């Protein structure tokens, strides 16, 4: 059985025991999280599609790690002006292990 959930403005297709990387969620490693925004359930019989969400369906998970993504460099230069700017950015991320899908 798999589900499509929405968190952090993005959609993720998940199944039990998957580890997904999502935008930062509050909590420490080992804490339980519940995703209520379930868009689709499939795998057993007819697939269920929400409009926009499926009432009563949840996906539970456990925070594995709070981490940061790779460094992204932003570089701007104005030609012939001896003017340039270099900035770096690392996005905060959370690794979540999916423990169950509750229809």
Swiss-Prot record:
Statement: the UniProt record of this protein carries the keyword rRNA-binding: yes
A GO term, aspect molecular function: rRNA binding
A Gene Ontology term for the protein's cellular component: ribosome
Domain of life of the native organism: Bacteria
UniProt GO BP: translation
Keyword Magnesium: no
Matches recorded under InterPro entries: bL21-like, bL21-like_sf, Ribosomal_bL21
Keyword line: Ribonucleoprotein, Ribosomal protein, RNA-binding, rRNA-binding
NCBIfam families per the UniProt record, alphabetical: L21
Described function: This protein binds to 23S rRNA in the presence of protein L20.
Assigned protein family: Belongs to the bacterial ribosomal protein bL21 family.
Oligomeric form and interacting partners: Part of the 50S ribosomal subunit. Contacts protein L20.
Protein name: Large ribosomal subunit protein bL21
Species of the source: Beijerinckia indica subsp. indica (strain ATCC 9039 / DSM 1715 / NCIMB 8712)
Name of the encoding gene: rplU
